[in-house]
């Protein structure tokens, strides 16, 4: 049951990461459309052959996916998603972080005092 709860907590972060990566991929593919092809000597290396083969295999899938999900790239949809994500997960991040830092500091000080010899760390009245 605990594993299921952890997976459900990680789902919004995973969705955000996938969305951001998809946006980056869409922007990069548009930026590289006008670039010239590499010189012939670069095309002969094995790594470039692997890259070109992977591009041949993946480019149609990426294009189809981008076309199908075009409604998602609209600014209002993305802005709405980000606003909802912020409201649900990040709005109270500052106070939560401050509380966590204070609790961590107190815990660390308590552990330090418990390890310190009484002669060195004793409180003076």
UniProtKB/Swiss-Prot annotation:
Q: Name one GO biological process term.
A: positive regulation of triglyceride storage
Span of the signal peptide: 1-27
Going by the UniProt record, its keywords in alphabetical order are:
Lipid transport, Secreted, Signal, Transport
Going by the entry's taxonomy, the superkingdom of the source organism is recorded as: Eukaryota
Q: What is its main location?
A: secreted
Q: Which GO terms describe its cellular component?
A: high-density lipoprotein particle; very-low-density lipoprotein particle
Subcellular location per the Swiss-Prot or TrEMBL entry: Secreted
The cross-references to Pfam families, in alphabetical order and at most eight, read: APOC4
Write out the similarity annotation: Belongs to the apolipoprotein C4 family.
Matches recorded under PANTHER family:
APOLIPOPROTEIN C-IV (PTHR32288:SF0)
Its job: May participate in lipoprotein metabolism.
> What is the protein named?
Apolipoprotein C-IV
Organism this protein belongs to: Plecturocebus moloch
């Amino acid at each position: 049951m605990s594993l299921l709860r952890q997976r459900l907590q990680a789902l919004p972060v995973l969705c955000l990461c996938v969305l951001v990566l998809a946006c980056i991929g869409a922007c990069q593919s548009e930026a590289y459309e006008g670039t010239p092809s590499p010189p012939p000597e670069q095309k002969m290396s094995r790594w470039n052959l692997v890259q070109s083969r992977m591009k041949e295999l993946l480019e149609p899938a990426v294009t189809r996916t981008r076309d199908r999900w075009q409604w998602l790239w609209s600014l209002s949809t993305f802005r709405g998603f980000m606003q909802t994500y912020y409201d649900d997960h990040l709005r109270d991040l500052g106070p939560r972080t401050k509380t966590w830092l204070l609790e961590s500091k107190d815990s660390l000080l308590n552990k330090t005092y418990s390890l310190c010899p009484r002669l060195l760390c004793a409180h003076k009245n």
